[in-house]
Amino acid sequence: MEWSSESAAVRRHRGTAERREGQAAASHPQREASAQEDARGGGRMRGRTESGGESRGAKTALSEARTALALALYLLALRALVQLSLQRLVLSRTSGLQGEFDARQARVYLEHITAIGPRTTGSAENEILTVQYLLEQITLIEEQSNSLHRISVDVQRPTGSFSIDFLGGFTSYYDNITNVVVKLEPQDGAKYAVLANCHFDSVANSPGASDDAVSCAVMLEVLRVMAASPEPLQHAVVFLFNGAEENVLQASHGFITQHPWASLIRAFINLEAAGVGGKELVFQTGPENPWLVQAYVSAAKHPFASVVAQEVFQSGIIPSDTDFRIYRDFGNIPGIDLAFIENGYIYHTKYDTADRILIDSIQRAGDNILAVLKYLATSDMLASSSEYRHGSMVFFDVLGLLVIAYPSRVGSIINYMVVMAVVLYLGRKLLRPNHSNSNYVRDFLCGLGITFISWFTSLVTVLIIAVFVSLIGQSLSWYNYFYIAVCLYGTATVAKIILIHTLAKRFYYVNASDLYLGELFFDTSLFVHCGFLVALTAQGFCSAFMSAVWVAFPLLTKLCVYKDFKKHGAKGRFIALYLLGMFIPYLYGLYLIWAVFEMFTPILGRSGSEIPPDVVLASILAVCVMILSSYFITFIYLVNSTKKTILTLILVCAVTFLLVCSGAFFPYSSNPDSPKPKRVFLQHVSRTFHNLEGSVVKRDSGIWINGFDYTGMSHVTPHIPEINDTIRAHCEENAPLCGFPWYLPVHFLIRKNWYLPAPEISPRNPAHFRLVSKEKMPWDSIKLTFEATGPSHMSFYVRTHKGSTLSQWSLGNGIPVTSRGGDYFVFYSHGLQASAWQFWIEVQVSEEQPEGMVTVAIAAHYLSGENKRSSQLDALKEKFPDWSFPSAWVSTYSLFVF
C-alpha cells in the first residue's frame, strides 16, 4: 500500500491533463466560474476541474513531522500547566498569623494520634488512648477560648443497627462504640448548628494518617482557632470525632440517630480520604440545597471541586462510601463531602504515615474548612435551610484558582443554547439546496460512520491486547509505571484512529480537497460532541457542562479562524490559532483526565480477582484518547502524509507490548519514596461445622490467603513456594459464604483464594454462640433467638434451606437484607466492653424440613491485641517480599444447622 499523498496527487494531475486535452474548446470564463463554484463548495467536486486537481499539492498540505510535533508539544504544555496547578497546594500562606489556621500545630496533633498506632474499634488504642488524647487537647482549647463562646463536650457510647446497600447489601450492628462530640456556640446558646465530621479509628495494621487522623488534626486546630476568635457566632458548630467509621459508618449512624445535639444540625462537612495528601476534593454535595455549594464557592480559599467526581462517585463505580451517606439517608441533612485523593496506592496500608502528608496539604485543608465553617456559622441561610432546598448545582474549579457554580436548570438552558448554535451552524450547510450540498450531506454522514468505526475498532484493538496480556499473566504491568499503559494502550488507540481515517482519505474521499475534508471532519466531531451534550442534558447529568465546553469553544474557534483558513489554507498560522481556540476544553479535559487516573489506577490494585484491570484501564484510556483526538482528526486530512506517525506509534506499541509480555515491568514497588505495594489478607482460621443434631462433622484450621488484585499469588509463589495452586481454597457449597470468615461481603469480588494448612488456634477470648430459644409463632413461622459473645468484630451469616424464607429479624429496620449471592450478612462490632449480643430471626417454613430450615454461621475476627497474632501467621508474614503489604489477623468460623 502506498502511503504518500503526493503519489495520489500525481495520478489525479495526470488525469486532469488528459481531460484538459479533450476540452480545448472550454472558454476561460467557464473555467473561472467553475473555480468560483469550487471555492463555494469547499473545493469538493467528484469530477475534478483544474482548480480542484491541485488541492492536495505541497502548497496546501501541512508537514507531517511539524504537525505531529506541534500537537505533541501542545498536549505536553497543557499537561505541564495541570501538573503545576496540582503542585501548588496553597495560593497564599497564612500559617502562624493570629486568628488563622496553623498547619504546624495541626501536624503536632496528627503525629500524636498516629504515634498511638493502628486504632481499630474496640481496641485500647482507639477506645482509651486516642479518646484520652482528644479530650486532653479539647480541655486545653477550652481553657484558651474567648469568653464570647461556650464549649460543651460529650463522650457518646451508642448502640444500634441499620442496613446498607453498600457492597451488595448487608446489615450492621454496633454496641458501645465511641464518639467524642464538641459543641462550640455563643454564650446564650444556639438553635441551629453546622456539623464537622472526622473519624479517628483506622483499619487494622495501618496508622491511618490520611484516613482519617489528619482530618481530626485539622478539626482540632479549627476548633482552637474558632474558640479563641473574638468574632461572635450566630449558630453552633458541632465537631464530631467519631470512633467507628471503618466499621462501615457505624459511629456516624449512632450520632445522627441518637445524640440529642443531632436535632440542631442543619448542614455538615465530612472530611475523608481515598489517598494520602495532595488536595482535598469536594466530590459530593447536597442532596439539593445549592446554597451549600455557594457557601463553599464564597468561602473556600483554595477551591478544588467537581460535579463530575460527584456523579462518578454516586454511580457506585468506586467501591467506597463515606459518612456522607449516613447523614443524608438517616438524618436527611445536606452536606459537603471532601476527601484527599492523591497517592491511593498506600491508602489503608502500613505506609499511610504522618510524614507522607505535606504541611501544605494540611494548611489548605485547614484554611478551607475554617473559612467554610465560619461562613455557615454566621449565615442566615442555615436557620432556614429548608427554604433553599431546590435543585442541584453545576460546579467545577478552574485549576484550583476559583470555582464556577450555577443551578443545574441554568446549566440546561446554557447547554440547549449551545446545541441551538450548532444546529444553526450545521443546518446552513446540510439544508442548503444545491448540488454541492448534496455531496456534503453524503460525505458528512459517511464521516460520522468513519469516526464511529475508528472508535469501535480502536477500542476492540486495545481490548484484544488487554485480554491477551491478562491471559498470559502480565496484568498490572503499568501499576508502578503508568506511562507503560500510555505507551501500550494509548498509542494503539491513536494509531488505529489515524489508520482508519488515512484509509478513508486514500480510498473513499479520493477526489476531495484537503481543506474540504479538514472542515468536514471538524463538523463531524462537533456533531458527535453535541450529541453527547444533548444526551447528558436530557438525562439530567450536571456533568454535561463538560460536553458544552467541548462544543462551544471549538465552534467559536471555527467561526473565528474560518476566513483565515479559506484565504490562506492550512498554514502554521492556522495551527496556532486553532490550538489557541482549543486551549480551554483541552486544558480542562486533561485536568479531569488526571483526576480520573489518579483515582482509578490505585483502585484497580485492590478491585478483586474477578475484574481484569487491564481491560478496565485500556477502556478508560481509549475513551480519553477518543475525546482528546476528536478535534485533531482535522489534521489527519490536512497533512501530506501519516505514514511516519503511524509507524512510530506502532513501533512504540509493539516494543512496549513485547516488554510487557516478557515481564520486564514489575507491577509493585517497595521504593520508600513512592511505594506501590501488593495487598494481601492473611487470616489464621479455625473452622468448625456442626450438623442438625449439634455434632461436629468437620473441623480444620489453616491460613486463609486473599490477594486483592487480579494477579492472585502468581508473583508471591516464587518467594513462598508453599503458596501455590495445590492449596487453592474450595467452596463449601452448603455453607454460607463458602464456609470462610469474610470480614465484609466481598466474596463476589474475590473468588480466588488459598488455604494453607496450619495448627489450630485457641484465642484467649473465644467466641461463644448458642441458641437461646426456639418458638413457633401463631402465623406458622419459627422464631430463633441467639446469643453471641466474642471479640470486637464478628460476622453473622444466614442461609435459608429450600422451602424456607427469612421473614423478619431484630436487626436493622426488621426487614432482612440479602447480600450478593443470596446469603444474609450481618457485620457486628462493639467498643471496649459490651454485653452479650442477643438477637432473633424469624423463618417462614412451608413444610417440615428433615435437614433443617436454616444454616447459620458466626465468624470472630481478632484485629487487635495478643489474640490477633499466631506464630505461624507471623512466620508466613515474614516470608512475604518487601513490595507486598500482608495484613494479618486471627479468625474463627463456626457453622450450625437448625
Curated annotation (Swiss-Prot):
It comes from the Eukaryota. One of its GO terms (cellular component) is endoplasmic reticulum membrane. Glycans are attached at residues 176, 724. Residues 37-57 have a biased composition (Basic and acidic residues). It is an enzyme of class 3 (hydrolase). Zn(2+) 1 binds at residues 199, 211, 272. One of its GO terms (biological process) is cellular response to oxidative stress. The keyword Ribosomal protein does not apply. It is a multi-pass membrane protein. Disulfide bonds join 198-216. Residues 1-59 are annotated as: Disordered. It is found in: Endoplasmic reticulum membrane. Keywords: Acetylation, Disulfide bond, Endoplasmic reticulum, Glycoprotein, Hydrolase, Membrane, Metal-binding, Metalloprotease, Protease, Transmembrane, Transmembrane helix, Zinc. InterPro entries: ERMP1-like_C, ERMP1_1-A_TM, Fxna-like_M28_dom, M28_fam, Peptidase_M28. Its cofactor is Zn(2+). The chain crosses the membrane at residues 67-87, 394-414, 452-472, 481-501, 516-538, 543-562, 574-594, 616-636, 646-666. Residues 1-66, 415-451, 502-515, 563-573, 637-645 are cytoplasmic. Widely expressed, with highest levels in ovary, kidney, hypothalamus and hippocampus. Within the ovarian follicle, expressed in granulosa cells, but not in oocytes. Present in both preantral and antral follicles, but not in atretic antral follicle. PANTHER family: ENDOPLASMIC RETICULUM METALLOPEPTIDASE 1, METALLOPEPTIDASE M28 FAMILY MEMBER. Within the ovary, required for the organization of somatic cells and oocytes into discrete follicular structures. Belongs to the peptidase M28 family. This is Endoplasmic reticulum metallopeptidase 1. The lineage of its organism: Eukaryota, Metazoa, Chordata, Craniata, Vertebrata.
